[in-house]
Amino acid sequence: MKLAVIGAMEEEVTILRSKLKDAKQEMIAHCEFTTGSYEGVEVILLKSGIGKVNAAISTTLLLDRFKPDYVINTGSAGGFHHTLNVGDVVISTDVRHHDVDVTAFDYEYGQVPGLPAAYKADEKLISITEEAVSELNGIQVAKGTIATGDSFMNDPKRVEDVRAKFADLYAVEMEAAAVAQVCHQFKTPFVVIRALSDIAGKESDVSFDKFLEQAAVHSTELVLNVIKRIH
């Protein structure tokens, strides 16, 4: 069993890296890959860099060179659903682009031509993640749609524009749809596990700086519990 875990920033991968046994690092095209094992599972940890282009490049390298059986994209996100608070964790049911618009040619908003409007997370990985939640104390976990764009969502108008397009959106961030799109094209099962560092549009830049570390801890705790169950 070979599992890949992708985080964009150092804060999002540092805890998991420290847990890997016999860890070895390799830089490929400015992307940092760390291979090792955790609880008997072979793990490839990728620090992708921020944004959709970085995520797509690094995920393509990951899937082509390391050929993992499953992919988990983890890290922080901005909360969108009214029930969520900073520190909560969102598990993806599906992932969409929130900054793609070719509706003039009869595609759905967020749909890249020739590809699905939504990238469905793997049901087995969702189920394992839900089981893994049971070991976490004091962390609220929700399941729903995550949307991706190359903008940090601290502008209330931008937040409302995106909210108007997606009625039941749980979280927004800057890499997951790119990861999901590449996984779709490689036919590799994936799930996204994101902890909320901020609530989109509500002084989110201040909240992000303050709560990024907490979000990283929460998301990594859940990822580690998933790895234990993924044999």
UniProtKB/Swiss-Prot annotation:
The keyword Amino-acid biosynthesis applies. Signal peptide: none annotated. It holds the Pfam family PNP_UDP_1. The keyword Lyase does not apply. Belongs to the PNP/UDP phosphorylase family. MtnN subfamily. Substrate binds at residues 78, 153, 174-175. Catalyzes the irreversible cleavage of the glycosidic bond in both 5'-methylthioadenosine (MTA) and S-adenosylhomocysteine (SAH/AdoHcy) to adenine and the corresponding thioribose, 5'-methylthioribose and S-ribosylhomocysteine, respectively. Also cleaves 5'-deoxyadenosine, a toxic by-product of radical S-adenosylmethionine (SAM) enzymes, into 5-deoxyribose and adenine. It catalyses: S-adenosyl-L-homocysteine + H2O = S-(5-deoxy-D-ribos-5-yl)-L-homocysteine + adenine; S-methyl-5'-thioadenosine + H2O = 5-(methylsulfanyl)-D-ribose + adenine; 5'-deoxyadenosine + H2O = 5-deoxy-D-ribose + adenine. It is an enzyme of class 3 (hydrolase). This is 5'-methylthioadenosine/S-adenosylhomocysteine nucleosidase. Pathway: Amino-acid biosynthesis; L-methionine biosynthesis via salvage pathway; S-methyl-5-thio-alpha-D-ribose 1-phosphate from S-methyl-5'-thioadenosine (hydrolase route): step 1/2. Gene3D superfamilies: Nucleoside phosphorylase domain (3.40.50.1580). The active site is at 12 (proton acceptor), 198 (proton donor). It comes from the Bacteria. Keywords: Amino-acid biosynthesis, Hydrolase, Methionine biosynthesis. GO terms for molecular function: adenosylhomocysteine nucleosidase activity; methylthioadenosine nucleosidase activity. PANTHER family: 5'-METHYLTHIOADENOSINE/S-ADENOSYLHOMOCYSTEINE NUCLEOSIDASE, 5'-METHYLTHIOADENOSINE_S-ADENOSYLHOMOCYSTEINE NUCLEOSIDASE. GO terms for cellular component: cytosol. Its EC number is 3.2.2.9. SUPFAM superfamilies: Purine and uridine phosphorylases (SSF53167). InterPro entries: MTA_SAH_Nsdase, Nucleoside_phosphorylase_d, Nucleoside_phosphorylase_sf. GO terms for biological process: L-methionine salvage from methylthioadenosine; L-methionine salvage from S-adenosylmethionine; nucleoside catabolic process.
